[in-house]
Design a protein with these regions (language model features):
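Structured, contiguous alpha/beta core segments that scaffold functional sites
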Residues: 1-126
Length: 127
């Protein structure tokens, strides 16, 4: 089901996504003296610039809209050779299938696009 056919639903999603994405997400260091913003932390750099094609506002808007429409948001963590996360790539929720078994609720994710299936194990943020 898509909100494009309902202008009221689309307007509500627009307000939600915009309102959520306006305040910036920050990384803090907690200490006895108080919380301190760490601007140069790798997680902060990633939150500010999730990937070359998206701003932080666009990524946050995607998360809110996906959760409101589909109940889930999926973000692929692209890693460098050292294992550090260097990009966050949003995945279309309708193309992600959550797999589990009797022992584990979630064992893997499958992303299906254009007839291809990509199995994703640990490199996904599921909201």
């Amino acid at each position: 089901m898509s909100p494009e056919g309902n202008s009221a639903a689309l307007a509500c999603l627009n307000v939600l996504g915009t309102a959520f994405s306006e305040p910036p997400l920050k990384v803090y260091l907690k200490s006895i003296e108080g919380d301190e913003v760490i601007d140069n932390h790798p997680a902060q750099v990633l939150l500010d610039n999730p990937n070359p094609n998206m701003t932080a506002n666009l990524m946050n808007n995607y998360i809110v809209t996906s959760v409101a429409v589909y109940g889930d948001a999926f973000i692929l963590k692209l890693k460098n050779d050292a294992g550090g996360v260097v990009q966050l790539i949003p995945l279309l929720p309708e193309m992600v299938e959550v797999k589990g078994n009797n022992e584990q609720l979630i064992t893997k994710y499958q992303y299906k696009q254009k007839g291809n299936t990509l199995e994703i194990m640990l490199s996904l943020i599921h909201i």
